Amino acid sequence: MIHRKHTYFNNTAGTRHLTLLVRVCTVLLMLLLVVPACAQKGLKVDEVFRRFGHERGSKMVEMNNTTLMGYRLKVYKSLIYKRNAAEIENILKGDRKQAKKIREVVEDGRVVSGYYMMTPAAKDLNRYVLFSKGSGGRGTVIYIEGDLSPDDIMKMCYSRK
């Protein structure tokens, strides 16, 4: 009977540990990327991004763990749309009902812009739904999650930088 010794190249204990470490880090990174993507889950604004974000003529931007105008944001997501304003407005009414704080700008008896402060996602992690309506069914919806106060939101929206 002949005994063969199997030789596995690069299969030392050190490389096995390194391979395991790489796999664990990859899984953790994937989980970290999924969490911000689910940030607005439970809010109606999530439906707006899902339904209209990839529609022709729409522009959607999503940034995670970024700085915008000097403010540190965990999630920034915006949608510029060219139609479906009435449908989007109806969807956002659901978030309005659940909002902790509501700020709206009214022109000629019509709400044209504003923001809703939602319940925090975690301690010191506030969530905001901002919107602006234009003419012809156009408008913008923004979701922000971060350590921002309502005053910070007002500064972001109305400062001239």
Predicted segments, located by residue:
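Bacterial Sec-dependent N-terminal signal peptides
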Residues: 1-45
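Flexible, processing/modification-adjacent segments and terminal tails
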Residues: 38-54, 148-161
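Compositionally biased, intrinsically disordered low-complexity regions enriched in proline and serine
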Residues: 4-12, 18, 72, 77, ...
